[in-house]
Curated annotation (Swiss-Prot):
InterPro entries: Cupin_2, OryJ/VirC-like, RmlC-like_jellyroll, RmlC_Cupin_sf. This is Cupin-domain-containing oxidoreductase virC. Residues 106-175 form the Cupin type-2 domain. The keyword Oxidoreductase applies. It comes from Hypocrea virens (strain Gv29-8 / FGSC 10586) (Gliocladium virens). Keywords: Oxidoreductase. Belongs to the virC family. GO terms for molecular function: oxidoreductase activity. It comes from the Eukaryota. It is an enzyme of class 1 (oxidoreductase). The keyword Oxidoreductase applies. Pathway: Secondary metabolite biosynthesis. Its EC number is 1.-.-.-.
Length: 194
């Protein structure tokens, strides 16, 4: 696919599975562009798709936008015949996928605090733009700045966008990988949202 230029007038309109979103809870963040590679008939790497992702959803009382960059249904990933491309396009993933992976970008409106939640997965969380407070259910917290990474090992947590002292939007990206069930003191910890 040829390089695509972003129309500045459309920078706050994001494609959803139902069409374009007319309002965006985190104005000022540039549109995320996804570049997917593959191979030509000679086995050389080529760009096969450039877009903004297949699945977008306004979440958190219309205060955040989730963009699924890519997802897979198995590990190792089957890429022959482009079966992974078909799966990612046709299936909006849940929080995480058993034996698979999810790459999710979330744009947060200013001062948004997510609910306390737990995913039974190993999550790599990267601050792309802004500053966030990662709060654990124990009460412990850490400030994360652009480029910082959290390794979330299925613990209950929440995110607070503190960018510009809570006056600006922020963006994070997560890569979620499946993990075995978490058992502590004979208690099986499940996914939850409070």
């Amino acid at each position: 696919m040829a390089d695509q230029q972003q129309n500045p007038q459309e920078s706050e309109l994001l494609l959803t599975s139902a069409g374009y979103v007319s309002t965006f809870p985190a104005p000022g963040l540039r549109r995320t562009v996804r570049h997917i590679t593959g191979h030509n008939a000679e086995g050389k790497g080529v760009f096969i798709q450039t877009d903004c992702g297949d699945h977008h959803r306004i979440i958190g009382n219309e205060q955040a936008l989730a963009n699924i960059i890519y997802s897979t249904k198995e590990t190792p990933v089957e890429m022959n015949g482009d079966v992974d491309l078909k799966y990612a396009k046709e299936n909006e993933p849940p929080l995480h996928i058993h034996n698979g992976s999810v790459c999710r970008m979330i744009d947060f409106a200013p001062n948004v605090i997510s609910p306390m939640h737990r995913a039974v997965s190993l999550d790599y969380g990267i601050v792309i733009e802004g500053e966030f407070k990662l709060i654990l259910d124990s009460g412990e917290s850490r400030i994360m700045r652009q480029g910082d990474v959290s390794v979330q090992r299925a613990s209950a947590h929440q995110w607070h966008n503190i960018t510009g002292n809570g006056t600006l939007p922020g963006r994070m990206m997560w890569v979620l990988l499946d993990c075995k069930p978490i058992v502590i003191n004979d208690i099986d910890f499940m996914e939850c949202s409070q």
